[in-house]
């Protein structure tokens, strides 16, 4: 029978008589008390026999019901005539009480003990505002006493932890905090930590604390702290185990000390020394990072080489002495011994008989005695003869020189001293009497070699060009070149003779550097070809201009990677144009469609109504990674209505224009001016854009704050130039050399974080240590420069050095680290160069000095390869050797395919001027020609020989 039934049944009878019984006891006690003290209170002198209220010796304790087992509540009081339990405000039935009565021998008072059982069902059926509770009520003849309330709850422990500990990887001596929230239970579970199934005693290890809200804290991690940690929760019902958390304590590698510098690897001259260090202090453990930096350092060393002495030439013999001997001497000065070198071996003085043995001391033969006058006369005759010979030779040299000048094809110099150093590298080739005429550096041993160095361009016009085309073969000795013969000492040092060029005077040949002459060729009222630049767009842009004529030239936008090459002859004779080029730095007018992105700046060249007779070359930088075929790249042009239309795909075949895609730039051959741009459509998620990442820093208004700005822009020079310009206005300084980041088109975002900030010198403002940029914002970063700002604060004004790492990484992609090590004081900061200086000077170069290949050499190359050849030695092989293997139909439509190929070569090599690559290509063609000659029939050889003679090849 349940507790409710007992309360309803037996409890009702108890309520009827228990109060009355208590009232009787109370009345009796009151009457006795009234007889002694007017009924107010018992006197203190009365013994505790029948005049004491019940005192509880044992009160009921809180209890928990485990599973279905009932619990017993007991209480004990003295003196007590009766004890009853009251649960949840209701009396417990008398039948449910079990009581015992004993006598306290020390006091002689009765001691009554009562207990009851409480079942799980009784507790579950109770629905009160508080827990199930019971208390004892004891009666004596003086009154009643109540015990404390004892709560009865059903014990349980849930299965699942509210929070399982998570595995951690921490550096050695770092802090480890493992969180554990045990399952809900009654009573609350106690937590114990296990390491590798062994209990952890925090009292025996001061480094471990398990008292903080069930968490495990290891203050300084040691290698021995690595292991599997388990949180154990237990109460009187059950035990529960959490998931194991693996803790790995790793050790980042540290460099050992540098070794001493090794000895120089060469005994003399320029060599190197090295020193090394190992990543063993400590060695990386448990997946710790390997040491950053180089394990080997090298420096150059220069040791003075010992120079052995060498004799000068012997001096002239001295005058014959009275002893019939004359002397000659030499000195050890060619060169003198230096740096411990050996002294010259041999005699420094030599003597011999000067009379062929006919000299007799004190008695000379009669025929050897000459008057003094005769000897003087012979000396005069000797010197007179030598003088006459010198004069004759000088007259002969002058006569030959004048004769050759009168017979030369060219009457005046068309290059000055400035042209000899006109900005391109020297072009060396050797001419041989026999061998392949196409080889720039023939492998055959010539019997006569003339070495020439072309140090400047040649300014030649059409009539002169025709004469040049009828000269001898391409690399035979040139009749229009005179060579200055230098001393044998210069030849021994390998210094090539400098060639001087002479040409006929021409009315349309202008001196170098006089570019202004082009603009003054026509009267001001007759200038239909000079365009006004006021019609240029007024948007934010970079712009450069130059005046060009028939000789052509090059227009360069400094530090942007954009350039324009006007070939020789592209502009008709006696015409000149003011050509401009600009880059849009505002909001791009080309709006991307779908997945298409802008890969280059919008470049405008003009004037748009200018007509050229030969395609010009426009170089536009781009930011696509073209090493893999994941892009579909298009060239687009803006129409007069402001719309963009596709000109061609880079991989398509076209005869209207030609695109050559290099890793960082696209070279386009065009015949009309306008606004052009490159767009790309990623074919797969592996398409990669090249981003340039850089960090700038500057002090803020608060003297303790320092601002870092991290930029991620397209890897084009003009995009970074815009960033540099903005930072200069804000007072920012470049803190680390920019680096390249490959950003995939996989839709994952970019994270930028600041790491390794000195903890006691600097602190970073909250919530700014790591910033995330959405993918679309980075993928279309050409709209405006993308940057994230970080604010650092110094603890004290005395801190002037800042060191930290900036990590730029794409989720599931590549990452780049910028190591900042700088002083925040501008006076102590090392300046980092923004751009190479090669574009910063001469934005407009006109005439021959703008080209790397001398014009005469260019004309002969074109004459050689434009003519079809039975052996395949034509312009197609020239294109192949210059890595031009596609869309050859474009060159076939040109009047001179070789000239267009060389124009493309000029555009690709505008910075390096690598004439060696062109020389190697021609040399390779020469070898192929030789191989074909060896396997051909004699008739074919003879025919080709006659053909070469007729065409001057």
UniProtKB/Swiss-Prot annotation:
Localization annotation: Cell membrane
Pfam families noted in UniProt: Death, I-set, TSP_1, UPA, ZU5
PTM per Swiss-Prot/TrEMBL: Proteolytically cleaved by caspases during apoptosis. The cleavage does not take place when the receptor is associated with netrin ligand. Its cleavage by caspases is required to induce apoptosis.
Induction: Up-regulated by p53/TP53 in response to DNA damage.
S-S pairs: 75-136, 87-134, 180-231, 264-301, 268-305, 279-291, 320-354, 324-359, 332-344
Domain Ig-like: 54-151
PANTHER family: NETRIN RECEPTOR UNC5, NETRIN RECEPTOR UNC5D
Subunit structure, interactors included: Interacts (via extracellular domain) with FLRT2 (via extracellular domain); the interaction is direct. Interacts (via extracellular domain) with FLRT3 (via extracellular domain); the interaction is direct. Identified in a complex with FLRT3 and ADGRL3; does not interact with ADGRL3 by itself.
Family per similarity comment: Belongs to the unc-5 family.
Its biological purpose: Receptor for the netrin NTN4 that promotes neuronal cell survival. Plays a role in cell-cell adhesion and cell guidance. Receptor for netrin involved in cell migration. Plays a role in axon guidance by mediating axon repulsion of neuronal growth cones in the developing nervous system upon ligand binding. May play a role in apoptosis in response to DNA damage. It also acts as a dependence receptor required for apoptosis induction when not associated with netrin ligand. Mediates cell-cell adhesion via its interaction with FLRT3 on an adjacent cell.
Stated name of the protein: Netrin receptor UNC5D
Species name: Homo sapiens
UniProt gene name: UNC5D
């Amino acid at each position: 029978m349940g507790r409710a039934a007992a309360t309803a049944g037996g409890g009702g009878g108890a309520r009827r008589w228990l109060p009355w019984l208590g009232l009787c006891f109370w009345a009796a006690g009151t009457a006795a008390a009234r007889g002694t003290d007017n009924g107010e209170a018992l006197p203190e002198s009365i013994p505790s026999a029948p005049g004491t209220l019940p005192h509880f010796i044992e009160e009921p304790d809180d209890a928990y019901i485990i599973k279905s087992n009932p619990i017993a509540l007991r209480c004990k009081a003295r003196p007590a005539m009766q004890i009853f339990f009251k649960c949840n405000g209701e009396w417990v039935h008398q039948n449910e009480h079990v009581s015992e009565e004993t006598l306290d021998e020390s006091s002689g008072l009765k001691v009554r003990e009562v207990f009851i059982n409480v079942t799980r069902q009784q507790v579950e059926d109770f629905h009160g505002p508080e827990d199930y509770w019971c208390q004892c009520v004891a009666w004596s003849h003086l009154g009643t006493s109540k015990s404390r309330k004892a709560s009865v709850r059903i014990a349980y422990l849930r299965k699942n932890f509210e929070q399982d500990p998570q595995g951690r990887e921490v550096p050695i001596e770092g802090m480890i905090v493992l969180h554990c929230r045990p399952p809900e239970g009654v009573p609350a579970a106690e937590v114990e930590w296990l390491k590798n199934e062994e209990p952890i005693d925090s009292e025996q290890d001061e480094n471990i604390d398990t008292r903080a809200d069930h968490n495990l804290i290891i203050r300084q991690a040691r290698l021995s702290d690595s292991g599997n940690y388990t949180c154990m929760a237990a109460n009187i019902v059950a035990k529960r185990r959490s998931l194991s958390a693996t803790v790995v304590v790793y050790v980042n590698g540290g460099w050992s000390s540098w070794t001493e510098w090794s000895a120089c690897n060469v005994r003399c001259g320029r060599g190197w020394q090295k020193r090394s260090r190992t990543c063993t202090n400590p060695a990386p453990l448990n997946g710790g990072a390997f040491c950053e930096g180089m394990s080997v350092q090298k420096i150059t060393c220069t040791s003075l080489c010992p120079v052995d002495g060498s004799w000068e030439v012997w001096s002239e013999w001295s005058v014959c002495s009275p002893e019939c001997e004359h002397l000659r001497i030499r000195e050890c000065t060619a060169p003198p011994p230096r740096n411990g070198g050996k002294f010259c071996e041999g005699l420094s003085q030599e003597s011999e008989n000067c009379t062929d043995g006919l000299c007799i001391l004190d008695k000379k033969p009669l025929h050897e005695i000459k008057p003094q006058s005769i000897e003087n006369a012979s000396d005069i005759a000797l010197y007179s003869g030598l003088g006459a010979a010198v004069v004759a030779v000088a007259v002969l040299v002058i006569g030959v020189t004048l004769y050759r000048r009168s017979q030369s094809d060219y009457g005046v110099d068309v290059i000055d001293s400035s042209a000899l150093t006109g900005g391109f590298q020297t072009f060396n080739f050797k001419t041989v009497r026999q061998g392949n005429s196409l080889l720039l550096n023939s492998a055959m041993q010539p019997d006569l070699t003339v070495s020439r160095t072309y140090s400047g361009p040649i300014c030649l016009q059409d009539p002169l060009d025709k004469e040049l085309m009828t000269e001898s073969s391409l690399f035979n000795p040139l009749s229009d070149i005179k060579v200055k013969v230098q001393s044998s000492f210069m030849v021994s040092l390998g210094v090539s003779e400098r060639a001087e060029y002479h040409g006929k005077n021409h009315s349309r040949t202008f001196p170098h550097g006089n570019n202004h002459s082009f603009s003054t060729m026509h009267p001001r009222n007759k200038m239909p070809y000079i365009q006004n630049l006021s019609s240029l767009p007024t948007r934010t842009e970079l712009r450069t201009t130059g005046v060009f004529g028939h000789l052509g030239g090059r227009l360069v936008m400094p530090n942007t990677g954009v350039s324009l090459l006007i070939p020789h002859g592209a502009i008709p004779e006696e015409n000149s144009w003011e050509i401009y080029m600009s880059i849009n730095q505002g909001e791009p007018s080309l709006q991307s469609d779908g997945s298409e992105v802008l890969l280059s700046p919008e470049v405008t060249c003009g004037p748009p109504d200018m007509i050229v007779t030969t395609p010009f070359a426009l170089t536009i930088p781009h930011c696509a990674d073209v090493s893999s075929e994941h892009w579909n790249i298009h060239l687009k042009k803006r129409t007069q209505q402001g719309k963009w239309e596709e000109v061609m795909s880079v991989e398509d075949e076209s005869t209207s224009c030609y695109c050559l895609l290099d890793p960082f730039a696209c070279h386009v051959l065009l015949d009309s001016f306008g606004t052009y741009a490159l767009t790309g459509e990623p074919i797969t998620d592996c398409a990669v854009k090249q981003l340039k990442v850089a960090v700038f820093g500057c002090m803020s208004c608060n003297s303790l704050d320092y601002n870092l700005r991290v930029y991620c822009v397209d890897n084009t020079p003009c995009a970074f130039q815009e960033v540099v310009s903005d930072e200069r206005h804000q007072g920012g300084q470049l803190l680390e050399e920019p680096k390249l980041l490959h950003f995939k088109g996989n839709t994952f975002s970019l994270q930028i974080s600041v790491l390794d900030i000195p903890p006691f010198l600097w602190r970073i403002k909250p919530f700014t240590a790591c910033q995330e940029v959405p993918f679309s914002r980075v993928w279309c970063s050409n709209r405006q420069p993308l940057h994230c700002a970080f604010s650092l604060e110094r603890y004290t004004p005395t801190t002037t050095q800042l060191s930290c790492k900036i990590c730029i990484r794409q989720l599931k992609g590549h990452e780049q680290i910028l190591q900042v090590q700088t002083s925040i004081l501008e006076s102590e900061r090392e300046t980092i160069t923004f751009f190479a200086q090669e574009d910063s000077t001469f934005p407009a170069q006109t005439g021959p000095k703008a080209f790397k290949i001398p014009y005469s050499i260019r004309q002969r190359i074109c004459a050689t390869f434009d003519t079809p050849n039975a052996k395949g030695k034509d312009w197609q092989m020239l294109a192949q050797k210059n890595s031009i293997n596609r869309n050859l139909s474009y060159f076939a439509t040109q009047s001179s395919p070789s000239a267009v190929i060389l124009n493309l070569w000029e555009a690709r090599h505008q910075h390096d001027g690598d004439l060696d690559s062109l020389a190697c290509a021609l040399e390779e063609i020469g070898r192929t020609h030789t191989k074909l000659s060896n396997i051909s029939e004699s008739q074919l050889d003879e025919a080709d020989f006659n053909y070469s003679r007729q065409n001057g090849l």
